[in-house]
Amino acid sequence: MNRTKTLLAILLVAAAFALLFTSVRSSKIADGAAPGLVAAGAAKDAVDFTLADAATGRPLHMKAAARQSPLVLDFWATWCGPCRAELPHLQALSQKYQGRVAFYGVNSSDTPPNIRAFSKENGLTFPMLSDTQHSVAFSYGADSIPLLVVVDTEGRVRSVVSGYDPDENVETSLSRTLDALLAEQRKTP
């Protein structure tokens, strides 16, 4: 009987952790907004930050970068299986939107040399930022990864997507969001 209770307790704890760490894709969408895009009036200001590029050591100032083009911030880690599965899709999108949308990986768990090595081994060419203090990840509410945050040129968070669903086409869904954002920004004087 004691053994059964212990086994049941272990299973419950394992299930709780599985629920906590299993990434379920979700996107916060306002009524009437384009798919995956929070309406501009309902969008919150993005948390400003400065992080070092893991490859060059140069600082990236988020607000200054966002003024140049919309940003996709991908919070990830090398040990995260769903993150690793999502990164090739983000690489393809970074090439598709080159010059129109800037993509940045934000890594909170690896050293810059490990981030550089991982990027090189996996053919990732978009900049990877080092957030070893977890300050930026926490300020964006990254309680699970991967977490994608789309920031418009006004510095507002327009889309937040948590997790990775291998059955969902990331490239298609994020493309729809980015296309809607770019179309909206073309209309704005």
Give a label for each model feature:
Residues 72-73, 103, 148:
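Hydrophobic beta-strand anchors of alpha/beta hydrolase catalytic cores
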Residues 117-125, 131-182:
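Thiol/disulfide oxidoreductase modules built on the thioredoxin-like
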Residues 44-46, 67-68, 98, 143:
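Extracytoplasmic
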Residues 69, 100, 125-126:
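A generic structural signal for alpha->beta connector loops
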Residues 84-122, 132-139, 176:
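Structural microenvironment flanking redox-active thiols in thiol-disulfide oxidoreductases
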Residues 69-71, 75-79, 144:
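Short pre-active-site segment immediately N-terminal to redox-active cysteine/selenocysteine motifs
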Residues 1-52, 173, 189:
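N-terminal targeting signals for export/organelle localization
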Residues 48-71:
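A short beta-strand-turn-helix
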